[in-house]
Amino acid sequence: MTDPFTSDGAKMPPKPFTIEEGRRQVRSFVLRQGRFTPAQQRAFDELWPRFGLDYTGAPRDLDAVFGRPAPKVLEIGFGNGAALRFAAQHDPARDYIGIEVHAPGVGRLLNALDDDGATHVRLYHHDAVEVLEREIADGALDEVRIYFPDPWHKKRHNKRRLVQPAFAQLLVRKLRDGGRLHAATDWADYAEQMWDVLDATEGLVNRAGPRGHVARPAWRPQTHFETRGQKLGHGVWDLLYDRESGMENRESPGQAPAAPG
């Protein structure tokens, strides 16, 4: 397969992003070129066997992957990995799975995880929808995090946004009862779409009430995407949803929930 991530003639990772043959769907991402440093290449060469999960299209036993029956947290589109690394450092009791299609970001996080001596983080370099559909069992996830997904701000591109009704229904299936969905965006229009979709999704309950959001929770560090957006005058919206029908865990709008222990 031809690797889509060539840049400056650099050799690219031996575990490239792959697209399942014979499938056509609207993608929520583009395969952007980016500089791939020698250190990031070494990370793929040397660290992928330890931290990487190759997409196979077959159901995966996550407890066997991590060697323990701990709660599982999935971050979709982890970018440079800052939030995922922070979470793993401060929450060793849970296992973390990250999905990202941008190879340099994956390489950077691989090096960071090695520096940290992390043992409870695994990464996919693949399309999140295919991973969820084919490799993650229903009810397997304690939490799903989606921080600053591509806003596709042009009206004609809105259909490419990740948060769509079918995707929300997929997340409900993969979350356990009582599980949590945490989404964040710095685009007001995307926040509106997230409310339109997620508030209407059966099985999801907005902790802050309809069209509500909370202050940035302690478990999400301020990212460079967020900082950039604030410099441009954008607001930031953190949306928390429980995968349950009860309303006992609702938060007041703008009030940050306690960080997990």
From Swiss-Prot:
Substrate binds at residues 154, 186, 223-226. Pfam families: Methyltransf_4. One of its GO terms (molecular function) is tRNA (guanine(46)-N7)-methyltransferase activity. InterPro entries: SAM-dependent_MTases_sf (IPR029063), tRNA_(Gua-N-7)_MeTrfase_Trmb (IPR003358), tRNA_methyltr_TrmB_bact (IPR055361). Residues 156-161 are annotated as: Interaction with RNA. One of its GO terms (cellular component) is tRNA methyltransferase complex. Gene3D superfamilies: Vaccinia Virus protein VP39. Pathway: tRNA modification; N(7)-methylguanine-tRNA biosynthesis. Keywords: Methyltransferase, S-adenosyl-L-methionine, Transferase, tRNA processing. Its EC number is 2.1.1.33. One of its GO terms (biological process) is RNA (guanine-N7)-methylation. Coiled coil: none annotated. It comes from the Bacteria. The active site is at 150. Belongs to the class I-like SAM-binding methyltransferase superfamily. TrmB family. HAMAP family: tRNA_methyltr_TrmB. Catalyzes the formation of N(7)-methylguanine at position 46 (m7G46) in tRNA. This is tRNA (guanine-N(7)-)-methyltransferase.
